[in-house]
Amino acid sequence: MQLKEAEKINNNMYFAYKKWRMRLKNFRYSFKLVYAATKFYTWISIFPALIGSVMPFATVYLIKLIVDETIYAAGSPDKMLAFKKVLLLIIIAGICFLLNHLSNVFDAYIKDVREQKFFDYIFNRIHEKTTKIDIENFDDDKYYDLFSRAFENAQSRPLYVVNQTITVVQNSIALLSLAVLLLTLHNAVFLVLLLATVPLGLVKLKFSKALYKWVRDNTRKTRKTWYINDLLTREEFSMEIRLFVLSDYLIRLFKKLRTEIREGYLKIYKKRMLFEVLAQFMAAFAVFGAFGVISYNTVIGVLTVGSLTMYLIAIERGVSLFNLIFKDLSNIYADSLYVEYLEVFLDIPIKEKDRETNQKFPNPMHKGIVFKDVSFKYPSSKRSVLQNVNINIEAGKTVALVGANGSGKTTLIKLLSKFYAPDSGKILIDGQDLKDIQLSSVRENITALLQNFAHYNFTAAENIKFGKAGKDEGIEKIIDAAKKAQIDGLIQSLPYGYDTVLGKIYNDSEELSIGQWQKMGLARALYKDSQIVIMDEPTAALDAQAEYELFSIFKEVLKDKTVLLISHRFSTVQMADYIYVLDNESIAEQGTHKDLLKKNGLYAKMYNKQALYYQQ
């Protein structure tokens, strides 16, 4: 039994040791991040901290001298001569006061600069991570929880840890100097300070940990309130919410979740408040007991009035400094817990990096693209999406992928774009295995026009230039792409031409229709001038006339490109040189439009259903 108890104690000690090692690791990581962002300002912040650390002692001692010398001068036969000494002390105190306040102003400026630089640095790190991590992370609910904790709760915490650590060091030096002063009065005075402050500090530490655990456990609920807030406030949901009269339901749901969050949060704070009140009673008893002892010693002549003033102020300042130190230590502890989320997020491994290879994407392609026995399932799913799929896309040809939703059409595009790698099989580009070709080279040679393409609230020129944002090829190339996409005339008619901001974000910006945005997306794809053009339901949101006009443009401007087309509209699919029909995770049929109709199989069945719908 004793052996088990000893083992339990050892285990508890081991886990406690591991926890503190983790806190220390988070603490070091905070300094590493802040120093990387603000080297110069981190070093220079030491100077105001040093000034602030010696000022409490200097101020308290100067007040003692001023009081004693003033009392002496009042009873001196040569009052003016005695007052000169008082005046000198007042001037020194004034200089210290001014120096302290100038130091505080300088320190506030340093902190503001460091905060701005650090936030820019952290945002850059987060943006680099979110745009480079493997796209499979976006299929994982745990990623969103981690992102929420890192972005909403942790992004500013490393800076707080560093700022509060500097403040703790500053206040500790100041407290040490006051403690030396108080020990000249009595050895027990310092114990009075501990009795007045330690219980309150322990309360803050305990409830910092409780609050952290509560925030962690309620991350998903908090995320849901943010999502509902987006539904209620963003323009893209506004019409549907009004048409379905969803607002009352969503507002009730938001209030319910917020009430649960608020009550859970306040429950912790109410309990903390109760413990803090008890700790404050203890502090008041200790401090005012010490005041009584000091006053008694002054009455019986042991202390001067100046010493009385000095010790009273020193005790008050000492208690205040102790409370600040414990408060900052509690905050450092809490903030360091959150820093771990930021570290884990920023350290998410990036798999889709360029391999150590010199192999570039063949340019120009001669043979084309071959999917050879490709099988794949998403990392977050147990269901296979593709099984032994074989597809041949000749260079310069347009190939269409047809099938029901979820049949794997878009997955093939993701595999070709190296967002994912096949579980088995190969994707060959002119005979080269895609996995051996540099990722950057693959992305340079593929462009896309998607169903849910982005509407960038930038200028018309920038919207097109984003096709190849890393290279500035001049306005002529932008205009050329716009002309090919037949959007140049519209852009020229806008108030500021190519410098007009698109969308609804500003008062002087201009919104486009869906068809016009689609042409803008086409211009962006043409500006990139890649060999392979992916078109994933590019006309799904267009009416028949707009679709016809857009595909007339497609036929003309993409005639020399290798095009991979996904569409449910057979009027669109007919433009393809060859068609693959996907069903049950594999290729069910393949051939030209005419061949597939003659087979009278799955393709013909889907085509006839759609044709009947249009006839009716």
Give the label of every model feature segment.
Residues 1-56, 75-89, 107-111, 128, ...:
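Membrane-integrated ABC transporters
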Residues 7-16, 125-156, 218-252, 344-357, ...:
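Short intracellular "coupling" helices and adjacent cytoplasmic loop segments at the cytosolic face
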Residues 16, 59-63, 97-139, 143, ...:
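Juxtamembrane helix-loop junctions of ABC transporter transmembrane domains
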Residues 36, 151-161, 213, 217-220, ...:
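An intracellular "coupling" helix at the cytosolic face of ABC transporter transmembrane type-1 domains
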Residues 42-106, 180-211, 285-292, 296-305, ...:
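Transmembrane helix-loop-helix hairpins at lipid-water interfaces of multipass membrane proteins
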Residues 130, 254, 371-373:
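Conserved catalytic Walker-motif region of ABC-type ATPase nucleotide-binding domains
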Residues 217, 246, 290, 311-347:
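Cytosolic ends of transmembrane helices, especially the final helix of ABC transmembrane type-1 domains
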Residues 359-616:
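ABC-type nucleotide-binding domain
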